[in-house]
Design a protein with these regions (language model features):
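ATP-dependent carboxylate activation and anion-phosphoryl transfer catalytic cores
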Residues: 10, 128-187
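Short small-residue beta-strand/loop micro-motif enriched in glycine and branched aliphatics
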Residues: 50, 119-122, 176-180
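Active-site nucleotide/adenylate-binding loops and adjacent lid/helix of ATP-dependent enzymes
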Residues: 1-82
Length: 187
């Protein structure tokens, strides 16, 4: 639902499809190939902390899809390369942003909860003021459109000078490695 709201309100987000896992896997593959192309990101609709998230090529798509068989619905979206930027919003105010440079392919579960994964946190984000204000404003707009309260963290990719909102987290982590507390302590 959130992606439909983003698209309706002209917030860039990757093209996506949602499937019920009971569908024939080869039919899913054909639809993904036709409407999205590869690579893609597959993930369960109802998980967090990057649990069950895979970046897939044509070659490993079905193999990774089978790993998600315990989930009823699967979100499949076009993979957007680029820089990972996270934005925190608190009580309808722009709290700040952080860039992540994971050693792994993306900021996955291990990178989020294990300091030895070696993800580099860059704060302040190294973009010009105009782009920083733009990404903060997009995150605030998404927060308000979804009628969120309290704190949210929006995950973006910055690619070819455009921000793509991947998702908005309504219950961002608050551990020692979590991003919202780090953003708050900087700002």
């Amino acid at each position: 639902i959130s992606k439909k709201i983003f698209i309706k309100n002209k917030i860039k987000t990757p093209k996506y499809l949602v499937f019920n896992f009971e569908l024939n896997k080869k039919k899913i593959f054909k639809k993904v190939k036709k409407f999205l192309g590869f690579p893609v990101v597959i993930k369960p609709v109802n998980e967090g902390s990057s649990v069950g998230v895979y970046i897939c090529t044509k070659k490993n798509f079905l193999f990774n899809l089978i790993k998600l068989k315990k989930y009823k619905e699967i979100l499949i979206e076009k993979y957007i390369p680029g820089r990972e930027i996270q934005v925190a919003i608190l009580d309808n105010k722009k709290l700040g942003a952080i860039e992540l440079k994971p050693k792994r392919l993306f900021y996955d579960y291990k990178a989020k909860y294990n300091a030895s994964a070696g993800t580099k946190h860059i704060i302040p984000v190294q973009v010009d003021k105009k782009n920083l204000n733009k990404v903060l404003s997009i995150a605030l707009k998404a927060h308000k459109l979804l009628k969120c309260r309290g704190v949210t963290r929006s995950d973006f990719r910055f690619y070819k000078n455009k921000f793509y909102l991947l998702e908005l987290n309504t219950q961002p982590g608050m551990t020692g490695l979590s991003l919202v507390p780090e953003i708050a302590s900087y700002n």
